[in-house]
Amino acid sequence: MDNPILNDHNKQEYEPAHTAEHILNQTMVRMFGCERSRNTHVERKKSKLNYDLPVCPTAEQIAEVERRVNEVIEADMPVTMEYVTRDQIPPEVSLAKLPDDASETLRLVRVGDYDICACLGSHVEHTRECGHFRISSTSWTPLVPQTLRTPQPSQPPATGSFRIVFRLDNPSEKY
């Protein structure tokens, strides 16, 4: 697609953490059947994501999330981008968070065959450049009914917000 017209994007994410966020999102979707994070704050020193879940994950599940994210990072998958029109979006890509005024052309970011989503942010070229993913803390906050999002038909209703704070150890020096 020549010279796609995209919405302005004012975020300059730290590439290793932003790619790790995509991997974490897909890991949470696969393990818990939830949507991608409700909100995300990506920074060089630490990043935070919140997920609406029916129950608080156990310590074992949290350790498994960390293990799976590192497994994807270590696989050194390519991170690629492609520009598509809305009618070319694959069915597995959710546009639920897309602003109403989003352009007709969207950029899809793929992390190997593990994840794909619409995104305008900066990324690494290969997952190993992220370094070692470490969950530094988690917290669980029960949600009151008026703050709950309506789940997809295949998802159990959320009862709380699960926050993950993560850091990256030894990311590539080129970022």
Task: Give the ranges of each region predicted by the language model.
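Active-/binding-site microenvironments in catalytic and ligand-binding cores
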Residues: 1-175
